[in-house]
Regions:
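Residues forming the flavin
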Residues: 1-229
Length: 229
């Protein structure tokens, strides 16, 4: 499985999960709770009684597109996108949640399955063809980031519309080592895999969570180690 870390504001995910009750999500972090109430204002004076409160929202998504399965994995509510590379020439991301899940952001792997006979693989590599493909994506991601552990990112709306990055400040992200906008739709995943992700995101995922595809959704590249070293 290969793909990206997709990140949304946690307040958006709360709203998608709870609707009008999203104002009842309280983490104890003043900045996070203020952001949640700004998105979900209420005139109700909420009780601090635990029965009146809701946990930070999470999600799980899955769809099949042709021969590929696309799904979210390791969803991290109130979390952070973190580096998971083992060499400076690679760029690999993962996700984590704090124990209190009180970050402004929520992230999850958004990956597509790749079979051992997939045309995207170089079959001349034999038994090492999947690992070779994984490493090639990680090296491409490092180049797109520009080095120094900077992560290449793209707004999900630009990815699905196949739009190049605009000259504007990089999007907000929990990734702490810096982000750089890139054309992930063109320069990272092979077209069949990118197209499958695009169809799942705009189809099944958007139907399940209206608002999943939006300017607030940011793809971080690349997620390659859900089931590989």
């Amino acid at each position: 499985q290969v793909g990206f870390r997709v990140e949304h504001p946690q307040s958006l995910v709360n709203g998608l999960a709870y609707g009008d009750l999203a104002c009842r999500v309280v983490t104890g972090n003043s900045r996070t709770d203020k952001a949640n109430l700004l998105r979900h204002p209420t005139e109700e004076v909420l009780s601090r009684d635990s029965e009146a409160l809701l946990p930070v929202a999470a999600y799980r998504l899955a769809a099949d597109v042709g021969d590929h399965s696309i799904y979210s994995f390791c969803m991290c509510p109130g979390g952070q996108v973190v580096p998971a590379l083992t060499k400076p020439s690679e760029m690999v991301v993962n996700g984590m949640s704090y124990s209190r899940r009180h970050s402004l952001f929520a992230n999850a792997a958004l990956v597509v399955s790749v079979g051992t006979d997939d045309p995207c693989l170089d079959q001349s590599k034999g038994a090492r063809r999947v690992l070779a493909f994984q490493r090639s994506l990680e090296r491409k991601a490092a180049v797109l980031g520009g080095g120094d552990y900077v992560c290449p990112v793209q707004r999900l709306t630009d990815f699905v519309e196949k739009r190049p990055p605009k000259k504007r400040p990089p999007p907000a992200s929990s990734y702490r080592l810096g982000v750089r906008e890139a054309s992930l739709h063109d320069d990272l995943l092979p077209d069949p895999l990118a197209d499958a992700l695009r169809e799942a995101a705009t189809g099944a995922f958007e139907r399940s969570m209206p608002g999943f595809v939006g300017d607030d959704a940011i793809l971080h590249g690349v997620e390659t180690r859900t089931s590989a070293p």
